A protein has these predicted regions:
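A gly/proline- and charged-residue-enriched helix-loop-helix capping module
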Residues: 92-143
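Short beta-strand/loop segments at the ligand-binding rim of alpha/beta enzyme cores
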Residues: 59-66, 142-149, 214-234, 294-304
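Glycine/Thr-rich beta-alpha phosphate-binding loop at enzyme active sites
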Residues: 30, 37-48, 187-200, 243-298, ...
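Glycine-rich phosphate-binding active-site loops on the catalytic face of alpha/beta enzymes
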Residues: 87-99, 184-186, 253-261, 314-341
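An N-cap/entry alpha-helix motif that binds or orients negatively charged groups
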Residues: 4-54, 118
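Active-site glycine- and acidic-residue-rich loops that bind
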Residues: 154-167, 194-195, 200, 227-248
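Catalytic cores of alpha/beta
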Residues: 74-83, 234-248, 294, 298, ...
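C-terminal helical cap(s) of enzyme catalytic domains, especially alpha/beta-barrels
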Residues: 98-114, 263-278, 330-354
Length: 354
């Protein structure tokens, strides 16, 4: 199937404008997710890898491979994602109210680099719409894989009031999220990355943690696992400061890394936005993961993201210190059954990709 996708289907899709192709893929996955029998057949064909589950953040993941945030922005088709071999899906980024995102064109392919540049700007339907979609299509308690919710700040919200957006989305989606990821690292919402700095970070993360503990106590359940997604463009000194806050506040993990605003020498595109996929982000992400792993002596679980387009690239993330991985751009280039390939290779943790 990988050969058919890469040699027949992908060339057809890549003749379309990138966001149009994304919308076609979204429609196909929504249709698939609405047909449980089809999902079951695809899942059976896929031989979804579940024989070596990963226990992390108090959750059980069928395998080490997740779909990164940005694909299923509104939580509309996690059932289809599960059938394609993923061990978890991260939906979003979602904001309290829906927003259109940045003007088109805002998504660009770089086939020679197996990369994408995006400046989407958190286009989504809002947290209430996501709640309804998850409740209807893949309700908590009837899942075979965890669903994380990636929450962000609305474009119009001042940085000083950003915490209100994160807390609002948390409250709305707490009943359907298995874990939450705090996204303060996208380069496509003006000023968002400033939240990674000392002026905002501690108070923001403390407020979200406080809301989490308060809700858990009120409802008599365990708190949700909380993760933070960071940029690859931070200095190691900045990474140290962020990790220190996460450890102090007992956050459950970190996702490393988001897209980069840097460009490798010789890259043909001059488009602005976040670069994902390719060797440049793969190597930088590996460096950040390994730095965090060593700095924390492995005490802070890491989900590795960035430049995973092969079994070998996925293995590098695990070797660097990641407990699990997420893919997005590599999935676009390698096709719908790429997750299955990765999951089966990674179940042995260190043997199949050598």
């Amino acid at each position: 199937m990988g050969f058919i996708y890469e040699n027949i289907l992908r060339p057809i899709l890549f003749k379309m404008e990138p966001e149009q192709a994304h919308d076609r893929g979204r429609a196909a996955l929504m249709a698939m997710g609405a047909l449980p029998t089809i999902c079951k057949l695809i899942r059976r064909y896929n031989q979804v890898c579940e024989d070596n589950p990963v226990r992390l953040f108090g959750l059980e993941f069928p395998n080490r491979v997740g779909l990164a945030a940005g694909m299923d922005k509104d939580g509309e088709y996690p059932r289809a994602i599960e059938a394609l071999g993923f061990g978890h899906a991260e939906v979003g980024t979602v904001t309290p109210e829906g927003q259109l995102g940045n003007p088109r064109p805002r998504l660009f392919r770089l086939p020679e680099d197996k990369a994408l540049i995006n400046r989407m700007g958190f286009n989504n339907k809002g947290s209430e719409a996501m709640l309804n979609a998850l409740s209807k299509n893949y309700p908590k308690g009837k899942r075979r894989m965890p669903v994380g919710v990636n929450i962000g700040k609305a474009k119009i919200t001042p940085l000083e009031e950003a915490v209100n957006d994160y807390v609002a989305s948390f409250r709305t989606l707490a009943d359907q999220a298995d874990y939450f990821t705090i996204n303060i690292s996208s380069p496509n919402t003006q000023g968002l990355r400033d939240l990674q700095g000392a002026a905002y970070l501690y108070d923001l993360l403390q407020s979200i943690r406080g809301e989490n503990l308060s809700q858990a106590k009120k409802l008599g359940r365990d708190p949700h696992p909380l993760l933070l997604k960071i940029a690859p463009d931070l200095t190691f000194k900045e990474v140290d400061e962020i990790v220190g806050v996460l450890l102090e506040l007992n956050y459950d993990g970190i996702i490393a890394t988001n897209t980069t605003i840097q460009r490798p020498r010789g890259m043909s595109s001059t488009e602005k936005g976040g670069l994902s996929g390719g060797d440049f982000i793969r190597k930088r992400s590996n460096d950040v993961i390994n730095y965090i792993y060593k700095a924390t002596e492995g005490k802070l679980p890491i989900i590795g993201v960035g430049g995973i387009d092969s079994v070998e690239a996925a293995g590098e993330k695990i070797d660097a210190g990641a407990s699990m991985i997420q893919v997005y751009t590599g999935w676009i280039y390698r096709g719908p059954f790429f997750a299955r390939e990765l999951a089966h290779a990674l179940k042995s943790k260190g043997e199949d990709w050598i």
